């Protein structure tokens, strides 16, 4: 399992399917955002005074993230996206 450092967040992106003429095109489109599930969260980031600022998201949250943000990584057969918390736009409720 991946354990992110600092203000980084590990996400599992929800793949969207688009149908065109009866064919399913996985991941099609040029959306500006992606929906993802938070898998793991770093401890946060420290201020110049050394105070720890906790992340705004937690494991199992569903979030909206910028589509081109982060780095795709593999852990075994699973693909994850590691982003900075600042790339997360909103928590989906």
Curated annotation (Swiss-Prot):
Q: Does the keyword Cytoplasm apply?
A: yes
Gene Ontology BP, a term = chaperone cofactor-dependent protein refolding
UniProt xrefs under InterPro entries:
Chaperonin_GroES, Chaperonin_GroES_sf, Chaprnonin_Cpn10_CS, GroES-like_sf
Under the heading Gene3D superfamilies, the entry gives: GroES chaperonin (2.30.33.40)
Q: Where in the cell is it found?
A: Cytoplasm
Positions in coiled-coil regions: none
Instruction: Mention one GO molecular function.
Output: unfolded protein binding
Keywords from the UniProt entry: Chaperone, Cytoplasm
A cellular component annotation (GO) from this entry: cytoplasm
The principal location of this protein is cytoplasm
State its role.
Answer: Together with the chaperonin GroEL, plays an essential role in assisting protein folding. The GroEL-GroES system forms a nano-cage that allows encapsulation of the non-native substrate proteins and provides a physical environment optimized to promote and accelerate protein folding. GroES binds to the apical surface of the GroEL ring, thereby capping the opening of the GroEL channel.
- Family of this protein: Belongs to the GroES chaperonin family.
Please give the subunit comment from the record: Heptamer of 7 subunits arranged in a ring. Interacts with the chaperonin GroEL.
Q: What is this protein called?
A: Co-chaperonin GroES
Please state the gene responsible for encoding this protein: groES
């Amino acid at each position: 399992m991946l354990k992110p450092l600092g203000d980084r967040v590990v996400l599992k992106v929800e793949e969207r399917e688009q149908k065109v003429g009866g064919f399913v095109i996985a991941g099609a489109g040029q959306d500006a955002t992606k929906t993802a599930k938070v898998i793991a969260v770093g401890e946060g980031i420290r201020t110049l005074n050394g105070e720890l600022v906790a992340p705004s998201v937690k494991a199992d949250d569903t979030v909206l993230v910028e589509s081109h943000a982060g780095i795709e990584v593999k852990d075994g057969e699973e693909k994850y996206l590691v982003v900075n918390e600042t790339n997360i736009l909103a928590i989906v409720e």
